[in-house]
UniProtKB/Swiss-Prot annotation:
GO terms for molecular function: N-acetyltransferase activity. PROSITE patterns: GNAT. It comes from the Viruses. Residues 102-182 form the N-acetyltransferase domain. Acetylates polyamines such as spermine, spermidine, cadaverine, homospermidine and putrescine (the latter with low efficiency). May play a role in the regulation of polyamine catabolism in the host during viral replication. Its EC number is 2.3.1.57. This is Viral polyamine acetyltransferase. Belongs to the acetyltransferase family. InterPro entries: Acyl_CoA_acyltransferase, GNAT_dom. Keywords: Acyltransferase, Transferase. It catalyses: spermine + acetyl-CoA = N(1)-acetylspermine + CoA + H(+); spermidine + acetyl-CoA = N(1)-acetylspermidine + CoA + H(+); spermidine + acetyl-CoA = N(8)-acetylspermidine + CoA + H(+); putrescine + acetyl-CoA = N-acetylputrescine + CoA + H(+). It comes from Paramecium bursaria Chlorella virus 1 (PBCV-1). It holds the Pfam family Acetyltransf_1.
């Protein structure tokens, strides 16, 4: 049995650990770059903390209060001004995501930074996305968007009314003289996906 909660400051360290662990194990760009949990945490701990602090993030916890699935959300204006821990291991990722910046929202927007689940077959990630959609509307957001890096999240977002507004193909993507994402075979593109509320 899993309980849906709104993430609060008492969960910050667990939320950061969960996302770092989940992404280096299953997120295509993190795997392609061979990121460690330390690399991921160093680069993204500030935004993960802010996602919890802003109060728009949710999780499912088990009976022992361990996070089993979560979604980290942040208002776009805060996301846009975020400072990251710059390490060379994540530079190609920032470069790739930067190529999606041709789309920026023109009204109050909530950004889905991360969604993940350690539990399969229970629909926990889908329930978290639905909760985000419901909550964003009640807080006056006009849009929700996320940068979806794998086919599973892309299909889930599309099923819930998100449209692709930008994409970059992994194969052949060049960072300097390297092609760091050529090893990604599970998904063809990274997609920026947007839902109008």
């Amino acid at each position: 049995m899993y309980t849906l909660i709104k993430l609060t400051s008492e969960y910050t360290s667990r939320a950061i650990s969960f996302t770092s662990r989940n992404f280096v194990a299953s997120e295509p760009t993190s795997i392609a770059l061979k990121l460690t949990t330390c690399d991921f945490t160093t680069s993204f701990q500030n935004i993960m903390k802010q996602c919890v602090d802003y109060g728009h993030s949710f999780a499912f916890v088990d009976a022992d209060d361990n996070i089993k699935a979560q979604i980290l959300n942040i208002p776009y204006d805060a996301y846009e001004n975020m400072h990251y821990g710059n390490i060379r291991e994540t530079d190609p990722m920032f470069d790739l995501f930067g190529n999606l910046d041709s789309y920026t929202p023109d009204d109050k927007c909530l950004y889905v930074f991360a969604i993940g689940s350690e539990v399969t077959g229970k629909g926990l990630a889908t329930k978290l996305l639905k909760k985000t959609i419901e909550e964003s509307s009640s807080h006056g957001f006009k849009y929700i968007y996320g940068d979806c890096t794998n086919i599973i999240s892309q299909n889930m977002f599309e099923k819930h009314g998100f449209e692709t507004v930008g994409s970059v193909k992994y194969k052949g993507y060049q960072y300097g003289i390297t092609k760091p994402f050529d090893s990604i075979n599970c998904t063809e593109y990274i997609k920026r996906m947007v839902k109008t509320i």
